Amino acid sequence: MAFPDTDVSPPRGGPSSPAKSPLLRSFKVKTYIPKNDEQNWVVVDASGVPLGRLATLIASRIRGKHRPDFTPNMIQGDFVVVINAAQVALTGKKLDDKVYTRYTGYQGGLKTETAREALSKHPERVIEHAVFGMLPKGRQGRAMHTRLKVYAGETHPHSAQKPQVLKTQPLEVK
């Protein structure tokens, strides 16, 4: 709709719309979205490293908190390969006192096992359980689970990705 004496249409919006106020036009918000085009791979040797310290290091690398452009709503972390999971250290009496529980889905199907039993049967699950507890719960956390690869022994099939070795501090025996 044009005014009768001009060919200019009226500005849209209310009295405080950015089209009318030159002051509000200068306060435009710019959102920075970092690019996630690099896929870094990291190898961590778990032999002799305390489980909690190892899990916090891995969780922060998967989440991407080590990056200067960390954005909480984007997955920008590294892929982490953990080797020697069977030799992870548990301090104190945790080998016998720490209990892992799972439910089979049937009545009376609550299964429990100590950390010693879990490390002897499937050491990968002990590290995965500790790391997954430190990642976000929800859709983004489930997507981060695929970035963790845990192996009980020394070898891993991810050498084609050329992973960098991440230094860890083994437990000092006193």
Swiss-Prot record:
InterPro entries in UniProt: Ribosomal_uL13, Ribosomal_uL13_bac-type, Ribosomal_uL13_CS, Ribosomal_uL13_sf
UniProt-annotated stretches for the region Disordered: 1-22, 153-174
Annotated GO CC locations: cytosolic large ribosomal subunit; ribosome
Gene3D superfamilies, sorted: Ribosomal protein L13 (3.90.1180.10)
Keywords on record: Ribonucleoprotein, Ribosomal protein, RNA-binding, rRNA-binding
Top-level division of the source organism's lineage: Bacteria
GO-annotated biological processes: negative regulation of translation; translation
PROSITE patterns reported for this sequence: RIBOSOMAL_L13
GO molecular function: mRNA binding; rRNA binding; structural constituent of ribosome
One Pfam family of this chain: Ribosomal_L13
Subunit organization: Part of the 50S ribosomal subunit. Contacts proteins L3 and L20.
Family, similarity comment: Belongs to the universal ribosomal protein uL13 family.
Role this protein plays: This protein is one of the early assembly proteins of the 50S ribosomal subunit. Binds to the 23S rRNA.
Protein name (record): Large ribosomal subunit protein uL13
Species whose genome carries this gene: Deinococcus radiodurans (strain ATCC 13939 / DSM 20539 / JCM 16871 / CCUG 27074 / LMG 4051 / NBRC 15346 / NCIMB 9279 / VKM B-1422 / R1)
